[in-house]
Amino acid sequence: MADNEALFTPELVFFDWECATPDEVFARLEGELAPRGYIASGWLDAVRTREDAYPTGLAMPAANIAIPHTDPGFVAKPYIAVVKPAAPVTFNAMAGMGAPVSAQIVINLGIAEP
């Protein structure tokens, strides 16, 4: 990832999504990322499986966040997608660090290199 600026693009910043669960966020992301060539087949199942095994919710001072991602094999082109849901979406806390987190911002990392 030599050009970090290319990771952040306006086309991958989304506001006011009506999503009640992480699965709904992931399904909407797949609908945006797949047609643009950012993800490979199987991404949706992979991100759900990884989130179940390794939750990504983080309680932060300014805004609670979640940082879902999957294995590099499901990323066709590196990216960072940002979702600001209309209402917070509950994610389990990272590394079992407390209660579930009401994420106000979801930052999906598409990392193609381990």
Language-model features: locations:
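Cytosolic covalent-transfer regions centered on His/Cys nucleophiles
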Residues: 1-114
